């Protein structure tokens, strides 16, 4: 797997200060995509053990609230295979330790053009490692960017069809109801100041 870019101290792609990994490769090709330079699977540089280690080191800073994975398309089958071991390393190094407000100490966000349904068994991008990967992710921003639905007031997403899914709450709801994650979606709740005011 290649990566197109790593942004340290990123505040645009998830809550708080984060390290954001932009993987290379996307077959979707959404018109108006903000990162079309990462569509090629050959773009950027190889995602090596040394790069993994540097990202994990960056997450160790107390001011860093977590990792964001975007692209490109993280859920392309090749990229899932390239990411799963790394994401499991991150989750093992930074387990879901709960803060007094109930949030995990370090969160993992993932932006994908797939809907959650497409990542379920029999879905377009379901692979042998999809469940392992989703099991490490806290917030999944799902759905393709649709230029006609672009809305500058939206936080952490570009078009109104995209959802910010709280996968931890969704997993709990799915277990309680005995159904798939896609049928038990719980949306992430933004802070009230952002939820009620345009950006």
Language model regions located:
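Ubiquitous "structural anchor" signal
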Residues: 22, 79-80, 151, 166
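N-terminal pre-triad scaffold of radical SAM enzymes
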Residues: 2-29
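Auxiliary Fe-S-binding modules of radical SAM enzymes
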Residues: 2-12, 60-62, 91-199
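Conserved Radical SAM active-site core
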Residues: 1-4, 17, 32-124
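Basic, gly/Ser/Thr/Pro-rich low-complexity segments located predominantly at protein N termini
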Residues: 30, 76-77, 148, 163
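Alpha-helix termini
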Residues: 27-29, 38, 84-85, 151, ...
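Hydrophobic pocket-lining residues within nucleotide cofactor-binding pockets
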Residues: 26, 74, 145
């Amino acid at each position: 797997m290649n990566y197109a870019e790593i942004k340290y101290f990123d505040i645009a792609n998830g809550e708080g200060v984060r390290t954001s990994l932009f993987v290379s490769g996307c077959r979707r090709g959404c018109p108006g995509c903000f990162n079309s330079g990462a569509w090629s699977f050959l773009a950027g540089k190889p995602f090596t053990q040394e790069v993994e280690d540097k990202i994990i080191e960056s997450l160790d800073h107390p001011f860093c609230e977590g990792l964001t994975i975007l692209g490109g398309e993280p859920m392309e089958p090749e990229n899932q295979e390239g990411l799963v071991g790394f994401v499991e390393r991150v989750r093992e190094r930074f387990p879901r330790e709960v803060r007094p407000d109930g949030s995990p100490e370090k969160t993992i966000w993932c932006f994908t053009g797939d809907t959650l349904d497409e990542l379920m068994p029999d879905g377009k991008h379901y692979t042998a490692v999809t469940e392992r990967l989703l099991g490490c992710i806290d917030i999944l921003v799902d759905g393709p960017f649709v230029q006609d639905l672009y809305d500058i007031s939206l936080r952490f997403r570009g078009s109104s069809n995209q959802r910010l899914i709280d996968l931890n709450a969704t997993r709990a709801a799915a277990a309680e109801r005995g159904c798939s994650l896609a049928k038990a979606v719980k949306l992430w709740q933004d802070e009230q100041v952002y939820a009620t005011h345009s950006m």
